[in-house]
């Protein structure tokens, strides 16, 4: 049968495997590519190729990540798998690989383990909206009651961390048997097809950036004589049309204004959309009323805040981070979108200090408010070098 030409006419969804070490995440990833390639065409990626994933730099942090892709009749999936536990933590906190949903792999022989818990908690904190469970190594458990027990334990754990434990799909199978199967219709491959089916039906199509409310971090401000003030930047999400009312948010009190022009590469446009680098002409705003670090946004879509909670990964010495720990009262810069803002860190009660290479929960108070929402990513810098990366998990005030 001739292979079909790959066309982007299907919805695209980003997923990844998470879970405890040696529970079979990488084997499952390889098995999915094999079964999907037998069923739909596409490339089979073997275990070794995924396991020796190249290291990538994301905001100065070294993360080893394997990227594979596969298709179902309904969708095109991009899937990330990380070789090491630390890589997962870095990946989820930096958002290097944004996930619309994750497949949590739990070995039926062990049940949920410490990293299973940690990954579910992190997924919750950083806003991975949907989880699907693959109970692996089920061929190694003879007692059906034991399988029931493990499934119950997983569901309870998911509920503890705020996922709908009763509704989450749980698929049982053996990733290794599926990887060694030679037909997509075999009994060994069936759980993989069930898993893909569960992803198709349980993880909804993600909302595209262009459909979200307009937001553009301001990078530069110009004054054009006779025309007014122009701010430039890359549109993060949504669409801006000429004539629309918008707000300038952060640093100073929020100002309401109107977009009187959009230009890109010196050409005038009717609108700018997610991904575009544009200049926006603002009605009756003076040059000194707006600055880099503020955002341009749809009315009432984002608000300025100073206090928040965050989940943070602190770079190790080898990654160019600090050589020494820090304590409550530490005052670094928080680099959010286009600007550095000084903030004071308070650690949780009972946490004495944070070592390089750790991840921790920070309570932060910035010296002035910036446009902020749950899920905002930031870097922590000290004298211009990155010493950490984090994500806002809760807005306090």
From Swiss-Prot:
The keyword Glycoprotein does not apply. Keywords: Cytoplasm, Elongation factor, GTP-binding, Hydrolase, Magnesium, Metal-binding, Nucleotide-binding, Protein biosynthesis. The lineage of its organism: Bacteria, Pseudomonadati, Thermodesulfobacteriota, Desulfovibrionia, Desulfovibrionales. Its EC number is 3.6.5.3. The gene is tuf. GTP binds at residues 19-26, 81-85, 136-139. HAMAP family: EF_Tu_B. Mg(2+) binds at residue 26. Residues 174-176 are annotated as: G5. PANTHER family: ELONGATION FACTOR TU, MITOCHONDRIAL, ELONGATION FACTOR TU-RELATED. Residues 81-84 are annotated as: G3. This is Elongation factor Tu. It comes from Lawsonia intracellularis (strain PHE/MN1-00). It holds the Pfam family GTP_EFTU_D2. Belongs to the TRAFAC class translation factor GTPase superfamily. Classic translation factor GTPase family. EF-Tu/EF-1A subfamily. GTP hydrolase that promotes the GTP-dependent binding of aminoacyl-tRNA to the A-site of ribosomes during protein biosynthesis.
């Amino acid at each position: 049968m001739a292979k079909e030409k790959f066309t982007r006419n299907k919805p695209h969804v980003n997923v990844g495997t998470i879970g405890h070490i040696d529970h079979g995440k990488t084997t499952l990833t390889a098995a999915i590519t094999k079964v999907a390639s037998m069923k739909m065409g596409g490339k089979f990626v073997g275990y070794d190729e995924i396991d020796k994933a190249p290291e990538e730099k994301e905001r100065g942090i070294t993360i080893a990540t394997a990227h594979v892709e596969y298709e179902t009749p309904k969708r095109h999936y991009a899937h990330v798998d990380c070789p090491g536990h630390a890589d997962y933590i870095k990946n989820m906190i930096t958002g290097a690989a944004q996930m619309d949903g994750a497949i949590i792999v739990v070995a039926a022989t062990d049940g949920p383990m410490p990293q299973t818990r940690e990954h579910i908690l992190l997924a919750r904190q950083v806003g991975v909206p949907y989880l699907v469970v693959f109970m692996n190594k089920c061929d190694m458990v003879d007692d059906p009651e034991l399988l029931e027990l493990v499934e119950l334990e997983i569901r309870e754990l998911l509920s503890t961390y705020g996922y709908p434990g009763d509704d989450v799909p749980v698929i049982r199978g053996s990733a290794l048997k599926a990887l060694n199967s030679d037909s997509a219709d075999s009994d060994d491959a069936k759980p993989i097809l069930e898993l893909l089916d569960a992803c198709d039906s349980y993880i909804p199509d993600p909302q595209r950036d262009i459909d979200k409310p307009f937001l553009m971090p301001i990078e530069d401000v110009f004054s054009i004589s006779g025309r007014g003030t122009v701010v430039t930047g890359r549109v993060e999400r949504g669409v801006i049309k000429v004539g629309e009312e918008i707000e300038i948010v952060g640093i100073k009190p929020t100002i309401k204004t109107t977009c009187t022009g959009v230009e890109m590469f010196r050409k005038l446009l009717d609108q700018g959309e997610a991904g575009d680098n544009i200049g926006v002409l603002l009605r009756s705003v003076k040059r000194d009323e707006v600055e880099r670090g503020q955002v341009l946004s749809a009315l009432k879509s984002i608000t300025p805040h100073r206090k928040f909670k965050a989940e943070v990964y602190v770079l190790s010495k080898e990654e160019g981070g600090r050589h020494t720990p820090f304590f409550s009262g530490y005052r670094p810069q928080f680099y959010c979108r286009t600007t550095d803002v000084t903030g004071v860190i308070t650690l949780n009660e009972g946490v004495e200090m944070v070592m390089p290479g750790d991840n921790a929960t920070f309570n932060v108070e910035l010296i002035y408010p910036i446009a902020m929402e749950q899920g905002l990513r930031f870097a922590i810098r000290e004298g211009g070098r990155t010493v950490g990366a984090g994500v806002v998990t809760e807005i306090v005030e």
